[in-house]
């Protein structure tokens, strides 16, 4: 995997911009397939997967925060809250007569959009408070639980409708980019489908977090170690897939696409 910068919010802001579509034609896709972006993203996902092989890290479902950074502990708390509450609060419409895609998924996805900014702000706040400010590389369980609780709260509380969104400050640019990846990670609210493109968006989201230093306090010239990546691959990915299984099963989302992610 290529070397990943550590950095903090201000460093990332200088690199961030709202994602924009560039692939429209077959030649565009051919260009992407030979690009540094495709190479780095594929390397990141491959390295993340291989981190679980012959690792000293032992994933314990009863203690999933072990080995995570504060920012990722916040993300885990948000994903866990989404998994345990949203489907129960927004059950599928049993009277809907559809072959694929229960219309209640639109309400689920609208909630994701509504609360995604709070979720990302919680991630960044925990990172700044415990990584950037304290310059630590290991955190005790009380710190990780505090961040997980903050992440959970961000997913459970309705967003402030009057709060400004989509601003143009450096911090806003970071949040806007991360938000675009996150809301595309859980299916399409109009097509009512879910596929490899949505899964890929979640790994782009993780990749972006890695690029801005959210995986931990590591030197800018050092790629994340296996011990750092294994908890992410097992704890974060497990929680993400649990949500995706839930929305596919309960809302009966249509399989998206037929050619893979690219």
Segments from the language model and where they lie:
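Polyanionic, low-complexity segments and short acidic motifs
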Residues: 38, 217-226
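Well-ordered alpha-helical scaffold segments within catalytic/enzyme domains
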Residues: 205-216
